[in-house]
């Protein structure tokens, strides 16, 4: 399985890198993708990460899952990216995997793809998970079908 981790300036470094590390240890292929037109993406704490791919060089036919790390203003940049929104909607239509952490599930809520699905997010972001069954008692790792 190939996972594309979407990075935008202001992403939360630990949310991106810890997930990437766990996925790689589980033998997933993980590619970092800068949604901007630059390879180095600055995290919320100004740590620069060199992305494997930039948006224009990304082939989503090679991807099985899109993962969105949270962080501010990174989550807002993800929300504002029209191309990413289109890819997320297409993945949802195809029943492909979509994952997000902390504030980033709000991107899915804004696209209306959480209707009738269980979701969890950073406290205070529940109002952005439009249509979701908010389940704060879920564990940190949850798979909902």
Task: Describe the role of every protein-language-model region.
Residues 19-28:
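A short, Lys/Arg-enriched amphipathic alpha-helix followed by its capping loop at the start of a domain
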Residues 31-96:
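Flexible gly/pro-rich beta->alpha loop and the following alpha-helix that scaffold active-site loops
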Residues 141-145:
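Conserved small/polar residues in nucleotide/adenosyl-binding loops
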Residues 114-137:
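A conserved active-site-flanking secondary-structure segment within enzyme catalytic domains
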Residues 18-19, 87:
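Hydrophobic residues within alpha-helices
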Residues 11-16, 40:
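Short N-terminal binding/cap micro-motifs at the start of the first secondary-structure element
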Residues 66-70, 88-114, 122:
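Catalytic nucleophile loop
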Residues 1-4:
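Extreme N-terminal starter segment of soluble prokaryotic enzymes
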């Amino acid at each position: 399985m190939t996972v594309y981790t979407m990075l935008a300036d202001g992403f939360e470094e630990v949310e991106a890198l810890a997930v990437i590390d766990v996925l790689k240890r589980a033998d997933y292929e993980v590619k970092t993708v800068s949604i901007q037109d630059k390879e180095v993406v600055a995290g919320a704490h100004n740590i620069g990460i060199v992305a494997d791919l930039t948006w224009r060089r990304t082939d989503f036919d090679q991807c099985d899952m899109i993962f969105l790390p949270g962080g501010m203003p990174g989550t807002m940049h993800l929300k504002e990216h029209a191309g990413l929104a289109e890819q997320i909607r297409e993945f949802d239509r195809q029943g492909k995997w979509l994952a997000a952490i902390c504030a980033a599930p709000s991107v899915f809520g804004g696209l209306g793809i959480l209707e009738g699905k269980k979701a969890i997010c950073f406290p205070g972001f529940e109002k952005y998970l439009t249509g979701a069954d908010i389940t704060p008692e879920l564990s940190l790792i949850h798979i909902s079908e």
